Amino acid sequence: MAAQRIRAANASGLPRCKSEGTLIDLSEGFSETSFNDVKVPSPSALLVDNPTPFGNAKEVIAIKDYCPNNFTTLKFSKGDHLYVLDTSGGEWWYAHNTTEMGYIPSSYVQPLNYRNSTLSDSGMIDNLPDSPEEVAKELDLLGGGWTDDQKESGRPYSNNPFWNGVRTNPFLNGNAQPSTDELNPKSTVDLLLFDTGTSSFTESSSATTNSTGNIFDELPATNGLQVEQPVKRDNPFFRSKRSYSLSELSVLQAKSDAPPTSSFFTGLKSPVPEQFQSREDFRTAWLNHRKLARSCHDLDLLGQSPGWGQTQAVETNIVCKLDSSGGSVQLPDTNISIHVPEGHVAPGETQQISMKALLDPPLDLNSDRSTSVSPVVEVKLSNLEVSTFIILEMKVSAEVKGDIFSKSTVVLQCLRSDSKEGPYVPIPLAYSYGDTIQVQLDNLEPCMYLAIVAQGPNILYPSTVWDFINKRVTVGLYGPKHIHPSFKTVVTIFGHDCAPKTLLVSEVTRQAPSPAPVALQLWGKHQFILSRPQDLRVCMFSNMTNYEVKANEQARVVRGFQMKLGKVSRLIFSVISQNPNELSDFTLRVQVKDDQDTILTQFCVQTPQPPPKSAIKPSGQRRFLKKNEVGKIILSPFVVTTKYPTFQDRPVSSLKFGKLLKTVVRQNKSHYLLEYKKGDVVALLSEERIRLKGQLWTKEWYIGYYQGKVGLVHTKNVLVVGKARPSLFSGPELSTSVLLEQILRPCKFLTYIYASVRTLLMENISSWRAFADALGYGNLPLTFFCRAELDSEPERVASVLEKLKEDCNNPDNKDRKSFQKELVMALLKMDCQGLVVRLIQDFVLLTTAVEVAQRWRELAEKLAKVSKQQMDAYESPHRDRNGVVDSEAMWKPAYDFLLTWSHQIGDSYRDVIQELHIGLDKMKNPITRRWKHLTGTLILVNSLDILRAAAFSPADHDDFVI
């Protein structure tokens, strides 16, 4: 029966799997001709006009013996020729030896002719022959005949995985000739594993691989005939020593569809022997060229960032510590968790649990009778002195079918191993219902690997385990954070439901160090039930005419054996915009079809937005927006509420205290830098640090309260002792009213635009009465602020604001007040902190623009390294008829720049003011030396949280405006 089954399988012309072995039915008699019944594609059969599905196999040669330890790997000896079908496994390649198929370790083989003189890159001229005849003989082998009729002849190079019709050995010919097959159109449906691809990502590097990281695609094998120029045998250099090089490949690799370019690299060609009078001159020139070629890459092509050589999913992991009370640890974005019962470790001890999801299963877990239905979960424990077990719970990607026969044939089984590659042993399930399972783990080890498989040990051919389960396959679409005029997406197919949020894409080059990998984001994923492992055709389309998927990349094929082995498949699609000036988000439709072109599933994914138009980036390190900052900066014109809190004048309790380690007396007095004496105690408003320049260099500072003043104290001069108030603390107690008065000191020195202030208040204050009370106009009627009756609440708010402006600017008023300070104080008493920080940020940017004025270009370079063209663009709207900007109007381009720059920084008002202060400190003659109030503003915005926490009742916060 086994032999009949093998013959039936081989009747279709497909090679057998290693797991079937070489079986002969002895009952039918044994003869030597029995082996001839096993038919597989030969190397020559792979090169016919109508190739088999394995027509893109790449020939390699074994460099050492390999004896397999499981049924899925292939045995071979040193010197054997193998034919690789898939290199996506990284360390393991899928290959056949014209008899059997299986996995081989990639380190045990080399591409055919890898050490040939045209491909070696040893960096030396070695293996010198003893006679000219030996060189000529070798060149005969490499270049064919020496006659002139070779112009019309051709020679196939399909067996050489690196050959693509470009000659790189200067001892053969210095002129690169295209192959005839480059003129032939490619099929629009390319195999995933061996796409010879002409897309830009294969051009971006000298050795950029395709979506599977296949090294054979660095220089794709051609299927046609190479057009060669005759090799001049009478040239004396061809009678001399041979040389080896692979260096020029990064320069000479040109694709048939690439337009000619005129750049520095266009003229970077190998020297031709005929150009030199002696062998030594040519050798020196050629070695110099190779040295240059090894260190250079075509920057025009590399500029098509990012490189797209290899894709690697970022494995999801988590590390957590639990004490004796137990708890649960869940892998982020997955349905995998570990439950630790109470009393697992002794009181006072901890258990550190590390979990990681490995996406590609080992080879042993998938066959006709078994298939993996979960990622391999790596569990590491720090403490083995435990008294209880732990429970692993997860959802799997398959369910056994509901009929009795399926339930009796296939079961879900948990396998465990101490090594990632196995061997795996089964352990019983504690609980199983539908697609949810629980496993009780005892006999704990420091490192364990666990996987769930659907197994049917008694399944007979031709049935497989897939016939008895409903297995879900996950399709994920990954792309960049923002879309661009030309970008690439990666479609991944997982044999389980664990799709990571990030996919790393790195460019493969022969350059060291390699470029940093680019992280792609998961745009969307979709699951569908796959009835059996089969070839899948994945197509992608755009719903907008402005965007199109490259024609030769609209469809990709995933081989059925990859689905059977549970390997993650990665397919790259290039998307191009027809009009780069009209970028917008759009929808991509992904279709998955079977080998009969029937749609199995399809889904749509919305792309992200294009990036902001300005390329200005913050110069400093970005700090994450604090949770309590998020709601404060968002202002809405639709806030409708009449209830405002009452500002409470009470002591500030949430202070920390520190002992001063040094006496500081400042020669240049500043309102915002404290002077103090060694041994005294200072109260710290928080332990958050502020960065600004001291006398010589940038330092870190705490906001402190000492002897009735709020200011900055150098962090190295303070020893933080905690929240307990020391008995040595002297000076008046810090209350909310004192703190409010102290931090508002710089407000009266800030410049403002009244119209913008009026608009903001009209949009965000919903009660003119509360606003008037906070300003000190208590119990005054509306007619006191305006003569006519106003119908809308925003107009009433504007009338109150107008009254404040008149009072502050009245020269007859003996006690003149600052408009900015009174306004900010009133808003803080109303708990409108979001509105305050918006006003403060606008005030600071405008004041800085006015103070910097004509020096704004220097500030722009310090903040964002703005180019001269960008600076001119900021000034162009403000130029007069003579094309110059008046000195009194120079604040306008400065303000335009600062507004644009602040939007690039983000929503954190603290970061905007902090980075602005650092940028001003970096100027040659910084204005912060004479204009200290930006430092006070930095103290203000960093003290708002503690003021708000002390002045208002937390129980009422939910009912108030921002």
Swiss-Prot record:
The SH3 domain mediates localization to the clathrin-coated pits and vesicles. The SH3 domain mediates interaction with DNM2 and the cytoplasmic part of TFRC with a lower affinity. The SH3 domain also mediates interaction with RRAGB, RRAGC and is required for the negative regulation of mTORC1. It comes from Mus musculus. The lineage of its organism: Eukaryota, Metazoa, Chordata, Craniata, Vertebrata. The keyword Secreted does not apply. The modification Phosphoserine is found at S131, S245, S250, S278, S295, S636. Gene3D superfamilies: 2.60.220.30, SH3 Domains. This is SH3 domain-binding protein 4. May function in transferrin receptor internalization at the plasma membrane through a cargo-specific control of clathrin-mediated endocytosis. Alternatively, may act as a negative regulator of the amino acid-induced TOR signaling by inhibiting the formation of active Rag GTPase complexes. Preferentially binds inactive Rag GTPase complexes and prevents their interaction with the mTORC1 complex inhibiting its relocalization to lysosomes and its activation. Thereby, may indirectly regulate cell growth, proliferation and autophagy. The keyword Nucleotide-binding does not apply. One of its GO terms (cellular component) is cytoplasm.
